[in-house]
């Protein structure tokens, strides 16, 4: 929830009797849940998010705003810092340094990828299409986690945009089945993680009914077979996408989404962002 502020009440999601909890993102909070187990019955008593050296905007009486800590500063443990320093250095060497270049910003901000098509999503999908030799590709907008600034691009930049290490997958799907699949996924609304990003695909609804689908500019032929790239999270039903994992023609590759994007930058830089602008 973009409107959540430290100290506000929050309730985790529950699905099929199982509590599902996530302490927001990027280590900003630690989630604390208190349960009672009595006579085999588990009850959630309390749940809250504890800010970790998180700065928030504070409005002053004179109308100005300043950035202040949401709670008392938590001093890092020096012994633990010293222990982790070696691993931090090793990790930094692996993810820093130029792997490619882009001539303009690639948009991946949350308030964009969940509402509209963006150039970064299209670059990500193109990378996965290249990896699988697909005709077109899709992914949920919630899977894009950060933008990539114009200029030199590092593996760190890519991992910030694609941090989940999902596997690149694809399905060879009959046109008739593809139409039925698209009838579902093209309806996911903006302002949700499920909102579909797509590339080399266009479609049209009329009276809330899917009436037109183009793949690479050509009308979908229900008698043909198409190859669609998708990550294994969405293919497994993530974000409410119809599950494809047991369908005929479905394949999960060994390549992660971040590695596919890294390889795309390495092989195709300098990248012209305008070529991936939504139309």
Please tell me what each predicted stretch does.
Residues 1-94, 189-197, 202-206:
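Active-site-adjacent helix-turn-beta-strand microarchitecture at beta-sheet edges
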Residues 8-19, 29, 41-45, 118, ...:
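Feature captures C-terminal
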Residues 45-153:
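Hard-cation-handling environments
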């Amino acid at each position: 929830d973009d409107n959540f502020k430290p100290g506000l009440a929050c309730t985790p999601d529950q699905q099929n009797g199982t509590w599902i909890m996530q302490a927001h993102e990027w280590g900003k909070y630690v989630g604390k849940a208190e349960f009672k187990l009595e006579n085999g019955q588990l009850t959630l008593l309390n749940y809250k998010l504890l800010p970790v050296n998180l700065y928030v905007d504070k409005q002053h009486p004179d109308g100005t705003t300043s950035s202040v800590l949401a709670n008392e500063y938590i001093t890092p443990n020096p012994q633990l810092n010293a222990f982790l320093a070696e691993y931090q250095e090793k990790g930094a060497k692996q993810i820093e340094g130029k792997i490619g270049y882009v001539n303009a910003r690639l948009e991946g901000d949350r308030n964009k990828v969940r509402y509209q098509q963006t150039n970064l999503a299209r670059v990500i999908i193109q990378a996965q299409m290249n990896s699988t030799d697909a005709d077109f590709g899709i992914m949920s907008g919630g899977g894009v986690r950060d933008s990539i600034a114009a200029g030199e691009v590092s593996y760190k930049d890519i991992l910030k945009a694609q941090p989940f290490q999902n596997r690149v997958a694809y399905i060879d799907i009959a046109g008739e089945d593809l139409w039925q699949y698209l009838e579902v996924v093209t309806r996911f609304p903006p302002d949700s993680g499920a909102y579909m990003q797509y590339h080399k695909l266009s479609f049209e609804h009329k009276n809330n009914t899917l009436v037109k689908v183009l793949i690479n500019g050509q009308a979908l032929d229900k008698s043909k077979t198409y190859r669609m790239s998708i990550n294994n999270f969405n293919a497994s039903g993530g974000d409410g996408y119809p599950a494809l994992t047991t369908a005929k023609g479905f394949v999960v590759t060994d390549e992660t989404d971040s590695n596919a994007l890294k390889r795309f930058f390495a092989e195709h830089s300098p990248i012209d962002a305008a070529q991936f602008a939504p139309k």
